[in-house]
Amino acid sequence: MRLSLVLAFLFFIGSCFGWVLELLYRHKKWINPGFCTGPYLPIYGFGLCTLFLLASLEDLHLIADPVWNRVALFLAMAVAMTLIEYIAGLACLKYLKVRLWDYSNLWGNIQGIICPLFSFFWAALGAAYYFLVHPYILNALAWLSNNLAFSFFIGMFFGVFIIDVVHSSQIIVKLKKFAEENKVVVKYESIKDHIRDFNQNAAAKYHFFSPFRSDSPLAEHLKEMYLKLEKQRDSRK
């Protein structure tokens, strides 16, 4: 089976399951965790592809001792996932003026994008993937090789995904415009929380898959949120 189809399949699985993982991680905050409208997070899709490729390297036995070979594998997974997280976060921060997540309050963080704690989580996730998930991934790929008709649904997923990215990019453009005009960095999760609270207070319908949908323009929500932040900063002085 071609590697491109394997990676496309893994990206599909990782993006969808990553979205579910993030949704559960947010505890009591019932809000779409993704950048896109649909139930998928691309960063986890890239992550699963990376974990699969690294796990496949274990057969090369680069280190003679099997225990240290696995330790090195888990460290490599942590480094790779942290690097993916840093590149994605930095690109959004520098070019889009949007902060998708913020680790500024965590020890040892770098630009609020990565930190030792989450790198440790990535290592733990890599180990969990290796022992609990990788065997099932291999079985799923074996099934896919015998049921290539399923690749139609993978193609359909990517068609919907691309349309979704184009649609979601329109919101990012508005956020970037506001950020550049006001010389601020927009915190993606904060503005989603703000709109959610606004809709609840106004007894308006909350759209889970469209967290930016509201009766008020997005620009008004951004202005109101940052005015509140400025007042909070002034009150602390």
Report each predicted region and the residues it spans.
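Aromatic-rich, lipid-facing transmembrane alpha helices and their immediate juxtamembrane interface loops
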Residues: 1-237
